[in-house]
Amino acid sequence: MANIKFIAVSRSLSGILDYVTNREKTVERLISGVNCMAQTAQDEFEAVKKQFRKTDGRSYYHIVQAFAPDDPLDFDTAHEIGLKFAEYFKGYQCVVVTHMNTAHIHNHIIMNSVNFENGQKFHQSAREMQQAKEYSDQLCREYGLSFTESKADPFRIPAWKKRLCRTIKEAMENCATREEFIA
């Protein structure tokens, strides 16, 4: 079964699309769109955001679906699984790209943060992440694939984030007014 990771957004939408579609990592037939055309995804994502006035905040989600190196899997089948997995996110536009340049086959799924049907922004709660992983596992079972253990708990809060929350909470408790806290 595939290991699913929601990757922290660190690039612009154009930057991540350039990265995942890099021809040193994939080929044209392994680049597809779900509810959009892969070649015009950036414009389509932005049009949906403008239509629903949701141009601020996170613009996309980056999901990696990695398969075990010893799975009896070819690139086209991995891509097919990636497309089916992307369809799980109903109403969201996704670009699905299968990378061929590492020991393990993996899909990159770039998903618009705004639903094109109702304008709702996607929020990746721990529950939603777990449900997505379970759906991916179900797809892998259907294709007779093995299980890939996650190297890290996807729901673990990083230590730096816990420290930051504690520091902010302490600062809030030591301030009498909002202005004092901001200063």
List each model region and its residues.
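N-terminal nicking endonuclease/strand-transfer module with a His-rich metal-binding environment
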Residues: 1-183
